[in-house]
Amino acid sequence: MNQLIIRAIEERFKKSNIPDFKPGDTVKVHVKVKEGDKERIQVFEGVVIARRGGGLRETFTVRKISFGVGVERVFPLHSPIIDKIELVRRGDVRRAKLYYLRTKKGKEAKVKEKTDYQKA
């Protein structure tokens, strides 16, 4: 009974405009940033290295290299601070968690592009 109530409440807060992306895919996450009384959109582009959780509590981790330094950011999937998520390219990987990319440098850290998929 409690599960049904929780699931019904969670359905109201879930976002519907989330693209189907997996670890290895390159995404652009448009994040709302509040500075003082102003609000603007900041784009964070990188490779999805993990997705975890489920339902309303699902999160995903995006990694990018900025000025030679690896930057990772964890985003709640259904958070109101996320304006939109754009899928840039599909990655061809065989793992669900790509934490091994943290130790790779330069071209080693590249994820191969998947060629046999249908673009939406």
UniProtKB/Swiss-Prot annotation:
Q: Name one GO molecular function term.
A: structural constituent of ribosome
Q: Name one GO biological process term.
A: translation
The family database entries (Pfam families) matched by this protein are listed as: Ribosomal_L19
- Keywords, sorted A to Z: Ribonucleoprotein, Ribosomal protein
Gene3D superfamilies from the entry? Answer: 2.30.30.790
Q: Mind telling me which GO cellular component terms the entry cites?
A: cytosolic large ribosomal subunit
Q: Which domain of life is it from?
A: Bacteria
NCBIfam families in the record: rplS_bact (TIGR01024)
Q: Which family does it belong to?
A: Belongs to the bacterial ribosomal protein bL19 family.
The UniProt function text for this chain reads: This protein is located at the 30S-50S ribosomal subunit interface and may play a role in the structure and function of the aminoacyl-tRNA binding site.
* HAMAP family from the UniProt entry: Ribosomal_bL19 (MF_00402)
Q: What is this protein called?
A: Large ribosomal subunit protein bL19
Its lineage opens with:
Bacteria, Pseudomonadati, Nitrospirota, Thermodesulfovibrionia, Thermodesulfovibrionales
